[in-house]
Structures are given as structure tokens and as C-alpha cells.
């Protein structure tokens, strides 16, 4: 009796499971096939029992395919399609005789397409009710019309939506501030979120109006700052609208009087805020933003305003984004930017001004990269913290530059944020992580020169033994292949007594004629060292002075000579190029003598006038 009860259910043999697995390219052992056969039998019995319940609820005695599919859906399993026909499917055996498959009926597509009989609809018979009058009020909607999504909102939400949109896009700034503040704190506007996202996506239609673009970005910023909204499905749409304001050549950017640069800066900051607060809601958001910025930056056909947006966007995302995208592409991009900055034609004036904007944005981004790379490598060198150092000489720059750091790509904060970059932001496969801080600084110094605010050593580390006299340091790059910002240069010819102050009493006396032996026998303390004199050879060697000492130190008192080059302004012509040297007229004089006259350089709106004294000859405007 017990044996009959055990064999009451149908069991699937192991051979059937093994054949099904082999048909898909899998080989199963006997133990695995037995376990799978037992599990399949249990699942089939469960689905059959549930489908029989659906059959009994419909008061039928015949089990249909729809009942079985309902049982599968109830168990969160995909339904079986293709077996809902009322006719029985003919089954044909395979040649081996172990498998059966339904026979496929051949259909002639040509005859089916040219057939004149139109097949009837296979939809099920249903009854639809249309109420013409209810409570004495007529139904104005036509029969069969689909209700719109707006009709699902309440009257209060619709009224709120219209008032907020009118306040944001209106002319009253105080009302706009109140509306934006309410968008940041209101917890009952979740149903209106798709409509506000649609309003923000209208940036493409108002690209000619900077004021409207600013307001739409403020709406997006308010939505992201609202802690009660779930922005997961709408993050990509909002990011696309923000990227449009950052990267695209807006119609308002044609007029040079429109300040579209501020719009791009604000949109870049908003993009950074979106990434750090909602980047975990969308997979691959960081990679998508980086690819968009890299595509714009690598396109030479794009206008310079688009390149400016790409640079500020990378800077806003953090120094790792600058290291990964901007720094490897800088050598290629610099050639096109240099060609724009070297064009002095009148027709290129506006493009050149845009080029200077891009130059400044790149300079700020790479300086941020240098500072963060130094801070990332400093703790592993055992040096003091960056915040506790007050002077550049106290920082262990030489040990950072001349020795490779093992943690140049650690998880460090970006753009003032304490959050690390997600995995894949800057992985080990990035070639920029293998570049040391010294190599980065040398390459950037070859591009920007003294425009870099961060100062590191550009030479080799100080050896223990003295260098031979003929040993020369190779330059970082050829002077013709790089561009440096135009600046006032001063060539300082320093006497052997470089450690004495220029204003000392012995500046031109017999002490200055004593020769190099006197300066070597009586070294003075560091506080009395002149600015133009070299530093002491020691651990601090490698820090570059602004005015480097000449290799051939002449005899005599120190004197300064200023060289100014530029274009003289003219009213009826383009002006002429000039280069003028201004030596000191009366013996040695400090460089501070000309400091009060330097602001005259660059003023072209005022007429040039001569000074009362003849020795002040800095009167040529550039």
C-alpha cells in the first residue's frame, strides 16, 4: 500500500533531463540530473495544482493553457507562449525516436500578402459602457477617447503647477525666489515631478535667452535639493538638459555681450552636485558624463565656448577627471589653442578672447590637479600635513618630485567633496596614474610657464657630490613648441655678492670689489639673501626662483633691465610691433622703482602721456 502511494505522481526520468541539457550544449552528471529531475517534478506539481484552482474558480472541468499561464504568473514565472490555440498541435518524432516536437506549418508569404480576404479581429468579445449623462451633467468627452494624464491630477496640484511655472518664468524676482524655495522643501509634489522635468527639458527651445536658461537650471537645482522626491527615473533626462547648457553652442553665445560663461560655470557646478548626490541611482552615470565631455573636447570643429564648458565640467567633477581626460589630451589640444592665441588679426579678436577664456579654465584645472596630486602623495612620504605648512620652503616638494609615489591614484576627495570616486572612475588601467608628479609638473610648466601659481622644482635633485662644470641641464621642451603667457620679464645680472641686500651700505663700495673669495669666506645668514641670489645647496635644492641667477656672474654692482614687447595702439591703423629695453639710468636701482608704473601697461582706452621724469620711459600702451 505504501509503495502505491509513493508512485502516485508522475516522475520525469533522468534521461529526459540529460537530453534537454544536451540540446542546449550542457553536459550533466547523473547526480545533477537526478536533483534537477526531482526539482522539476515538484515545480510542475505546484503549477498544476495552482492552475487547477483557477479552473475550479471558473467552474470548469477542463484545464486550459490560460489556467496554466495564470499559475505561472502567480509564481512570478514567465508564461508559456505559443500553445493557446484551440486546435491540437501535431507532434512529430525525431529520427532517433526519443524526442517529439510540434510540426511547423509552412506559410506562403506571397499568397498571404496578395490575399483578398481580410482576417477578422481576434480580440475577445467585450462590452464597453459610455455614460452620456450622469447627475444631470453631460459627458463632453467623445466616445472611445483615452483620458489624458493631466486629468488624473487634482485641481490643487494643477493650480500649484501653473502658479509655480508662471512665477519661475515671470518677471517678479521675489516671487520666483519663493517658488524655488518651495520646490526645495515641498513634500507633496511627487505627482508633479514628470511635469517639472518636462519644463526643465525645454532648455533647447530657449537657447537664445540666457535669463530663461538660468531660471530653468535653478528649477533643476531645486528639484535635486528636495529630499522628498525620488529622482531615479529622471536623472538621465535632467543630466542631458544640464549638459546642453554646459557643452552646446547656445544661440545667445553669438553676441559677445551676453555672459554665457557664467551660465556654463553654474551648469558645471550643478552637474557636479548631481553626480555626488544622485550618481548611485543611475549605473554608468560617471562614465557617460566623462565620455560626453571628452567627445566635445576632442572635436576641433566645435567652437571654443563648447571647449570651455568641457574644461569647467571636468574641473567640477574633480581632479581625477582632469587627470583622466584633460591631461592626456592637453598636448594635442594645445596646438589648436596656440594657433588661435597667435592670430593677431582684427577679425580674430573675438575668437582670441574666447581662447583666453579656455586658457584660463585649463590653467585653473591643472593647478587643482597639481595641488591634489601633491596632497595625495605627501602623507605617504611621512612629511607634515599640507594645512600646517605656512611656507613653500617648509614643504617636502623635492622628495615628492624626484621619487615616485606608490599611491598617486588613491581615493581622494574631488572638488571639495569628501567622497571617493566610484569604481571605474580612475582605475589601474589609466595611463595617467603611472605618471609621477615631477613629469606632470614639467610638462605643464612647458605649456604655461610662470603662469602656474604652484611652484615646484623643474631641475634634477641635488647630488651628494658637486657637479662637473660642463654638466648642463636639458630643457623640458623646445621653446618653439610651447606657448607661455605674455608677461613682464626682468633680466637680473647679479654680482658675486648676491647674499647682500641691494640697499646695503656696501653695495658699491670696496666690499663689492673683493671678488668671489670674500663671499665664500664670509657667508651671511639666510635672512640677508637677495631675491635674485641662488639658494643654499642642500635639501631644499630644486625650488625654482622667479629670477634665476646667471651662469656667468659679471663683475660690478647689480643692475636690472626691463624688456617690453607688444603692439603700439593706433587710431587709424593696426599699430606697429615693438620691443624696447629700459635700462636703469642712474646706477643700480631696485626693481620696485618701476612697480608704480606697471599698471600703465595694457590701458588702451586712455591716451598715452609722457611722464615728467625722463628715466620713467614706460609710457607705451600695449
From Swiss-Prot:
Q: Which residues carry this modification: Asymmetric dimethylarginine?
A: 555, 561, 593
GO molecular function annotation: DNA binding; protein heterodimerization activity; RNA polymerase II general transcription initiation factor activity; transcription coactivator activity
Q: Print the keywords alphabetically.
A: Methylation, Nucleus, Phosphoprotein, Transcription, Transcription regulation
Kindly list the GO CC terms recorded for this protein.
extracellular exosome; histone deacetylase complex; nucleoplasm; nucleus; SAGA complex; SLIK (SAGA-like) complex; transcription factor TFIID complex
Question: PTM Phosphoserine: at which residues?
Answer: 495, 501
Q: Name one Pfam family in it.
A: TAF
Record carries keyword Nucleus: yes
Superkingdom of the source?
A: Eukaryota
Q: Where is this region: Disordered?
A: 403-430, 457-546
InterPro entries according to UniProt: Histone-fold (IPR009072), TAF6 (IPR037796), TAF6_C (IPR011442), TAF6_C_sf (IPR046344), TAF_TATA-bd_Histone-like_dom (IPR004823)
Q: Compositionally biased, Low complexity: which spans? A: 511-522
The record's function comment reads: Functions as a component of the PCAF complex. The PCAF complex is capable of efficiently acetylating histones in a nucleosomal context. The PCAF complex could be considered as the human version of the yeast SAGA complex. With TAF5L, acts as an epigenetic regulator essential for somatic reprogramming. Regulates target genes through H3K9ac deposition and MYC recruitment which trigger MYC regulatory network to orchestrate gene expression programs to control embryonic stem cell state. Functions with MYC to activate target gene expression through RNA polymerase II pause release.
Q: Which family does it belong to?
A: Belongs to the TAF6 family.
- Name assigned to this protein: TAF6-like RNA polymerase II p300/CBP-associated factor-associated factor 65 kDa subunit 6L
* Native species: Homo sapiens
Q: Which gene encodes it?
A: TAF6L
Amino acid at each position: 500500500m505504501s509503495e502505491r502511494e509513493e508512485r502516485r505522481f508522475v516522475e520525469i526520468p533522468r534521461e529526459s533531463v540529460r537530453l534537454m541539457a544536451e540540446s542546449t550544449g550542457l553536459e550533466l552528471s547523473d547526480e545533477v540530473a537526478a536533483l534537477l529531475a526531482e526539482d522539476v517534478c515538484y515545480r510542475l506539481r505546484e503549477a498544476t495544482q495552482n492552475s487547477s484552482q483557477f479552473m475550479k474558480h471558473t467552474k470548469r472541468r477542463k484545464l486550459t493553457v490560460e489556467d496554466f499561464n495564470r499559475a505561472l504568473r502567480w509564481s512570478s514565472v514567465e508564461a508559456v507562449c505559443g500553445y493557446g490555440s484551440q486546435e491540437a498541435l501535431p507532434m512529430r518524432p525525431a529520427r532517433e525516436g526519443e524526442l517529439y516536437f510540434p510540426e511547423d506549418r509552412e506559410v506562403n508569404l506571397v499568397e498571404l500578402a496578395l490575399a483578398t480576404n481580410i482576417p477578422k479581429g481576434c480580440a475577445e468579445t467585450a462590452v464597453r459602457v459610455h455614460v452620456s449623462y450622469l447627475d444631470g451633467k453631460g459627458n463632453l468627452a467623445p466616445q472611445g477617447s483615452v483620458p489624458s494624464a493631466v486629468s488624473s491630477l487634482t485641481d490643487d496640484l494643477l493650480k500649484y503647477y501653473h502658479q509655480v511655472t508662471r512665477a519661475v518664468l515671470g518677471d517678479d524676482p521675489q516671487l520666483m525666489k519663493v517658488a524655488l524655495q518651495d520646490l526645495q522643501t515641498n513634500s507633496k509634489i511627487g505627482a508633479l515631478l514628470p511635469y517639472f522635468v518636462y519644463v526643465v527639458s525645454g532648455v533647447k527651445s530657449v537657447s537664445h535667452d540666457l535669463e530663461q536658461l538660468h531660471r530653468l537650471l535653478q528649477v533643476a537645482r531645486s528639484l535635486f535639493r528636495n529630499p522628498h522626491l525620488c529622482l531615479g527615473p529622471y536623472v538621465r533626462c535632467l543630466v542631458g538638459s544640464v549638459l546642453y547648457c554646459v557643452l552646446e553652442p547656445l544661440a545667445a553665445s553669438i553676441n559677445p555681450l551676453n555672459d554665457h560663461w557664467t551660465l556654463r560655470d553654474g551648469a558645471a557646478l550643478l552637474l557636479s552636485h548631481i553626480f555626488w548626490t544622485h550618481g548611485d541611482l543611475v549605473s554608468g552615470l560617471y562614465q557617460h558624463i566623462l565620455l560626453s565631455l571628452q567627445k566635445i573636447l576632442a572635436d576641433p570643429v566645435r567652437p571654443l565656448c563648447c571647449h570651455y564648458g568641457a574644461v569647467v565640467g571636468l574641473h567640477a567633477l574633480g581632479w581625477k577627471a582632469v587627470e583622466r581626460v584633460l591631461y592626456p589630451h592637453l598636448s594635442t589640444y594645445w596646438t589648436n589653442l596656440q594657433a588661435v592665441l597667435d592670430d593677431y588679426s582684427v577679425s580674430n579678436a573675438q575668437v582670441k578672447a574666447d581662447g583666453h577664456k579656455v586658457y584660463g579654465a585649463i590653467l585653473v584645472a591643472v593647478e587643482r590637479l597639481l595641488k591634489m596630486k601633491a596632497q595625495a602623495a605627501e602623507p605617504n612620504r611621512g612629511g607634515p600635513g599640507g594645512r600646517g605648512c605656512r611656507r613653500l620652503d617648509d614643504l617636502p616638494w623635492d622628495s615628492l618630485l624626484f621619487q615616485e609615489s606608490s599611491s598617486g591614484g588613491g581615493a581622494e576627495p574631488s572638488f571639495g567633496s569628501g567622497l571617493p570616486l566610484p569604481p571605474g572612475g580612475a582605475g589601474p588601467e589609466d595611463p595617467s596614474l603611472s605618471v609621477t608628479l615631477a613629469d606632470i609638473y614639467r610638462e605643464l610648466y612647458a605649456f604655461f610657464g610662470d603662469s602656474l601659481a604652484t611652484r615646484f622644482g623643474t631641475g634634477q635633485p641635488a647630488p651628494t657630490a658637486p657637479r662637473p662644470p660642463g654638466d648642463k641641464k636639458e630643457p623640458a621642451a623646445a621653446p618653439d613648441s610651447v606657448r607661455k603667457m605674455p608677461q613682464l620679464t626682468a633680466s637680473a645680472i647679479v654680482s658675486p655678492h648676491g647674499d647682500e641686500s641691494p640697499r646695503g651700505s656696501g653695495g658699491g663700495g670696496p666690499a663689492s670689489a673683493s671678488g668671489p673669495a670674500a663671499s665664500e669666506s664670509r657667508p651671511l645668514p639666510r635672512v640677508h639673501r637677495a631675491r635674485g641670489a641662488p639658494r643654499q645647496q642642500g635639501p631644499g635644492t630644486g625650488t625654482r626662483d622667479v629670477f634665476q641667477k646667471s651662469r656667468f656672474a659679471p663683475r660690478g654692482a647689480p643692475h636690472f633691465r626691463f624688456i617690453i614687447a607688444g603692439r603700439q595702439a593706433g587710431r587709424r591703423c593696426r599699430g606697429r610691433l615693438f620691443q624696447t629695453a629700459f635700462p636703469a639710468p642712474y646706477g643700480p636701482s631696485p626693481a620696485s622703482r618701476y612697480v608704480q608704473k606697471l599698471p600703465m601697461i595694457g590701458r588702451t582706452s586712455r591716451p598715452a602721456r609722457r611722464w615728467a621724469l625722463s628715466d620713467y620711459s614706460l609710457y607705451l600702451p600695449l
